[in-house]
Amino acid sequence: MSSQVIPALPKTFSSSLDLWREKNDQLVRQAKQLTRDSRPSLRRQQSAQDTLEGLRELLLTLQGLPAAVPALPLELTVLCNCIILRASLVQAFTEDLTQDLQRGLERVLEAQHHLEPKSQQGLKELWHSVLSASSLPPELLPALHCLASLQAVFWMSTDHLEDLTLLLQTLNGSQTQSSEDLLLLLKSWSPPAEESPAPLILQDAESLRDVLLTAFACRQGFQELITGSLPHAQSNLHEAASGLCPPSVLVQVYTALGACLRKMGNPQRALLYLTEALKVGTTCALPLLEASRVYRQLGDRAAELESLELLVEALSATHSSETFKSLIEVELLLPQPDPASPLHCGTQSQAKHLLASRCLQTGRAEDAAEHYLDLLAMLLGGSETRFSPPTSSLGPCIPELCLEAAAALIQAGRALDALTVCEELLNRTSSLLPKMSSLWENARKRAKELPCCPVWVSATHLLQGQAWSQLKAQKEALSEFSQCLELLFRTLPEDKEQGSDCEQKCRSDVALKQLRVAALISRGLEWVASGQDTKALSDFLLSVQICPGNRDGSFYLLQTLKRLDRKNEASAFWREAHSQLPLEDAAGSLPLYLETCLSWIHPPNREAFLEEFGTSVLESCVL
């Protein structure tokens, strides 16, 4: 690029430039001082806002003059300082920042008389016009590269990666056909150094380039972790860890590396990275959550639950206000983790639920019951609006939490407490149910409005029946199981692809069938306990008709037929059942409360009995 002759400055203008530069330098020092300010957050924020206003006023003064090359380095530097401080204050890149960038580029073209009147060029076109100008003065390059780095930051944060690639190719002097590897382009970019004396800048182009480099490596690594490109994710995450990585981001990177190694089948190495993440010390929630997953993979239940307990504590701790950031840092360029990402930590209540559910699943019913009660106390707070149908897929909805809590209480032998939870749930959901007389006619219409409500109420009656059964109150248990079945046989399955994860599990055809089977077998067992085998037989037979191949139902049906001395019917049923394909395991696709209910009716000697019965049938056939 050839330099152009710069006319001598009038003495008064030169003096004004010196004053304006001093003003810029003073404001920059003021902004940097705020990072060491120990005053309360609101006062620091106000001071930063005042500094930004000072920079904006200075910028308006400079932009109010005719565009001139001698003043442009200062003007562009002030513009960069405004953008950096503004983005730091709001911790985001708002759309109006593009107007500032556009105005800065237009001023560069105006100074060189290259801007056409009433030009409507976009940012891409303006950058091309500025950077391809043959007469671009060298003294403008440092400030222009800083402005370009802010443009790069904006485009990365808004996922305009093609525009960013083209800009970097132009800055590197590359042709369009050259490398499109953003990581390589960022490494190749070497912003020119400022010549002394130059106006102070909050963050120069080289610093911003390093931020971009680390942020892009993080973004790529995190995304590849989600999509399953684990070797590429590992490579990018190592790149990020070796770069300009602030502590909060380093925790995420080490945790992501741990998740990557866990998925690659290296849990022990994963723990090493998670230990490093904990040593960084800014936040321990994320590595603790990942550690619980690693310990679960290793089968170390005690360590898994301990990690989850520490996670709940970590998320409940109050954090002191962070120091003010007057710079653009890597965090600003990282999107919020997707709920499906291993880097999504969630809230304290979500962590508490995870702990409670894992306690229930691993046989620690007493602990599970206490955790569920704590969780419900935390979430409910007297608000009935939380019992509306779920709208997100982030874990179970409140009614399902109540059902899980009741199941945990029954499992822990606390039937009366379980009844209390169930009564509370019924009180809060009864107003959402249509009247029984009109339920059948309105089933389809109501299913669209309140798709899970009939299932919630049915499951509540099932759990109440189990609680009464534990208390040896057969009459009440039979009544609850019957109410459950009456409602269930009026409930229609829904499209499993619609709604949240909570809705899909509770409304699926498989879930409804299993819920009916659980209620029928539970009622049948109460009939058996009261000596009414004929009524029990009817329920057991209906359960295997609903779910052909269900081995629990088959066990109870065969036992009852045997007790009633109906051996021929039992043999015929066994032969028919034996010819059917085994029922697929529905575990994992069912709500946790239902899995727990099904575990209660699962006879421990089922397989031995069925095998022995089958052998006797075959022997009788031979004879």
From Swiss-Prot:
Compartment annotation: Nucleus
Keyword annotations: DNA damage, DNA repair, Nucleus, Repeat, TPR repeat
Ranges of the TPR repeats in the UniProt entry: 251-284, 349-382, 458-491, 517-550
UniProt-listed GO biological process terms: DNA damage response; interstrand cross-link repair; mitochondrion organization; ovarian follicle development; response to radiation; spermatid development
GO cellular component, one term: chromatin
Tissue expression notes: Highest expression levels in spleen, thymus and testis.
Domain of life assignment: Eukaryota
PROSITE patterns referenced in this protein's UniProt entry, alphabetically: TPR_REGION
Main location, first listed in the record: nucleus
Chain coiled-coil ranges: none
Subunit text: Belongs to the multisubunit FA complex composed of FANCA, FANCB, FANCC, FANCE, FANCF, FANCG, FANCL/PHF9 and FANCM. In complex with FANCF, FANCA and FANCL, but not with FANCC, nor FANCE, interacts with HES1; this interaction may be essential for the stability and nuclear localization of FA core complex proteins. The complex with FANCC and FANCG may also include EIF2AK2 and HSP70.
Role of this protein: DNA repair protein that may operate in a postreplication repair or a cell cycle checkpoint function. May be implicated in interstrand DNA cross-link repair and in the maintenance of normal chromosome stability. Candidate tumor suppressor gene.
Name assigned to this protein: Fanconi anemia group G protein homolog
Organism of origin: Mus musculus
